């Protein structure tokens, strides 16, 4: 029986992936380097150090990474100050989860300060039973460590957890951890080899009917 819903954050709860992409591409252009959308897709759901390693390899180390990082982060913060919206269906889904008495966890590759900033305008963060950020793990997605840590800290088994993700890296982490997984794609579609093991939906509102297929209905 389903006991917990484990949420990714960027691109799933918040519409942040597009401004991450703009920031990474802006910082590349500042050094005369073009980061295409196809190149950026490799970074979705992956922690920054690994993304930067891929980027350095892609440009054969012809990039000043210290300068790049500073420009990228400054541009991201500038864009983020304009406001970040919740993704379609999150409000209703979160309410439905709480009505069913299910446990919730936030499991993100982002750092804790970014989590606090994103949730500041909304009354949701303190409603999560567990929060796992980049600071808590040694290995980023697609490694399963974050989701293994989540269900263990919650005192549950992997099969009692449903992971919601927008990225292939996150889905791979969830499946490797032994959890059920639903993908709500944001900037890229699910990889073909994953399709038989997951459910793919258009938005978070569509997750609500699945809750009753895994566990007790709301009363």
Regions found by a protein language model. Give the residues of each.
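Short, surface-exposed acidic
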Residues: 33-41, 61-70, 158
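Metal-dependent phosphoesterase signature
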Residues: 55-94, 100
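Short beta->alpha linker loops
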Residues: 19, 46-47, 71, 85-89, ...
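An amphipathic alpha-helix signature
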Residues: 21, 25, 48-53, 65, ...
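Active-site neighborhood of HAD-like aspartate-dependent phosphohydrolases
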Residues: 1-42
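Asp-based, Mg2+/Mn2+-dependent phosphohydrolase catalytic module
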Residues: 1-3, 95-98, 111-219
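Helix-loop "lid/cap" segments that line or gate small-molecule binding pockets
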Residues: 27-28, 47-61, 118, 151
């Amino acid at each position: 029986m389903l006991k917990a819903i484990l949420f990714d954050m960027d691109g799933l709860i918040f519409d942040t992936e597009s401004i991450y992409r703009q920031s990474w591409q802006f910082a590349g252009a500042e050094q005369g380097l073009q980061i295409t959308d196809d190149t950026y897709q490799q970074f979705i759901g992956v922690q920054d150090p690994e993304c930067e390693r891929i980027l350095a390899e892609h440009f054969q180390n012809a990039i000043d990474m210290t300068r790049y990082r500073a420009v990228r982060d400054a541009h991201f913060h500038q864009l983020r100050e304009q406001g970040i919206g919740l993704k379609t269906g999150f409000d209703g889904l979160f309410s439905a989860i709480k009505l069913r008495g299910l446990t919730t966890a936030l499991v993100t590759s982002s750092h804790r300060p970014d989590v606090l900033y994103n949730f500041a305008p909304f009354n949701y963060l303190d409603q999560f039973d567990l929060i796992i950020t980049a600071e808590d793990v040694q290995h980023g997605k697609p490694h399963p460590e974050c989701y293994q840590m989540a269900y263990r800290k919650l005192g549950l088994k992997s099969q009692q957890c449903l992971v919601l993700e927008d990225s292939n890296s996150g889905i791979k982490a969830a499946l490797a951890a032994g959890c059920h997984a639903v993908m709500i794609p944001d900037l890229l579609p699910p990889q073909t080899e994953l399709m038989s093991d997951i459910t793919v939906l258009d938005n978070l509102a569509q997750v609500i009917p699945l809750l009753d297929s895994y566990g007790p209905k709301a009363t």
